[in-house]
């Protein structure tokens, strides 16, 4: 993949990542990984060696889209890659119910600036964003640690377990691994990472039991076979947090942990896994 296939935010991040001399850890995944707080995790894993953690999660990400960044990730030479996966990462028609914010929220999240009138004048809003982008993203603080998404209000509200239990999930089609394009692209990335001596660990991200129950057994089995192939055939360590936090009120919907303070337990559990792997 060439650099010009990347979004502006991606190009900017990868072109500046070498300014960080510390050992680097990349968190890669979809919106399921957005609750992970890099600064909190850095304090949690503080050791003799200093690590800079970057949460590269993106809404609706999957292996088919992430592979566009493959060359850039390799060039960045992270010391460890934590890749978050769940059922939808290997599905072909996963429902977006309760998975993604609305269109306005998605635009706000992916436009580098907060532009209230963006939808009224998209052209002007886009030009303003490009003009001011570099002023916003070069601060070197929490924003550069979450370069591909903005910390928006919709990431914080906590839904009670009683309310969550009323939400009905839906099935999703997960092809067998031999015909699964998502898995084939994931496998290609993992092989390239290995060729370049990059260490990868997979974490299965949390999901409420009510969502899992709506997935048919054949699709669950296909997912399990894919995860087994990742663990055995690709020789990648896989940690599952899928069934964690079921009874804890830290969810903003059935598939996502809140970015608010109660959700930091997710960051801490991933940090514990990092400590085992570094």
Feature names for model-found ranges:
Residues 1-24:
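N-terminal secretory targeting modules
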Residues 27-28, 32-114:
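Membrane-embedded segments
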Residues 55-57, 204, 240-242:
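Residue-level recognition of beta-strand->loop/alpha-helix junctions
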Residues 85, 99-196:
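Secreted/periplasmic serine-hydrolase-like ester/acetyl group-modifying domain
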Residues 153-155, 190-215:
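Active-site segments of SGNH/GDSL-like serine hydrolases
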Residues 207-241:
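Substrate-gating cap/lid alpha-helix
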Residues 253-278:
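Histidine-centered active-site loop/cap adjacent to the catalytic His
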């Amino acid at each position: 993949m060439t650099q010009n296939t990347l979004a502006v935010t991606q190009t900017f991040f990868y072109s500046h990542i070498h300014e960080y001399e510390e050992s680097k850890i990349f968190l890669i995944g979809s919106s399921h990984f957005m609750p992970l707080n890099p600064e909190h995790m850095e304090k949690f894993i503080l050791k003799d060696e200093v690590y800079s953690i970057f949460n590269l999660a993106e809404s609706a990400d999957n292996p088919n889209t992430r592979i566009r960044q493959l060359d850039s990730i390799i060039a960045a030479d992270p010391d460890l890659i934590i890749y978050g996966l769940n059922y939808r990462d290997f599905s072909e028609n996963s429902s977006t119910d309760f998975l993604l914010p609305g269109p306005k929220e998605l635009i706000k999240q992916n436009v580098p600036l907060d532009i209230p009138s963006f939808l009224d004048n998209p052209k002007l809003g886009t030009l303003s964003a490009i003009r001011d982008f570099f002023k916003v993203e070069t601060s070197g603080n929490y924003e550069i640690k979450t370069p591909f998404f903005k910390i928006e209000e919709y990431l914080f509200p906590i839904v009670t377990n009683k309310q969550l239990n009323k939400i009905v999930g839906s099935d999703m089609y997960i092809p067998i691994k031999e015909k699964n394009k998502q898995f084939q692209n994931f496998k290609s990335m993992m092989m390239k990472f290995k060729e370049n001596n990059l260490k990868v660990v997979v974490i299965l991200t949390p999901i409420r039991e009510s969502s899992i129950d709506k997935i048919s057994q054949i699709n669950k089995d296909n997912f399990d076979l894919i995860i087994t192939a990742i663990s055995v055939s690709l020789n990648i360590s896989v940690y599952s947090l899928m069934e964690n936090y079921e009874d804890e009120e830290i969810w903003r919907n059935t598939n996502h942990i809140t970015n608010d303070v109660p959700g930091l337990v997710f960051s801490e559990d991933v940090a514990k896994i990092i400590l085992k792997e570094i």
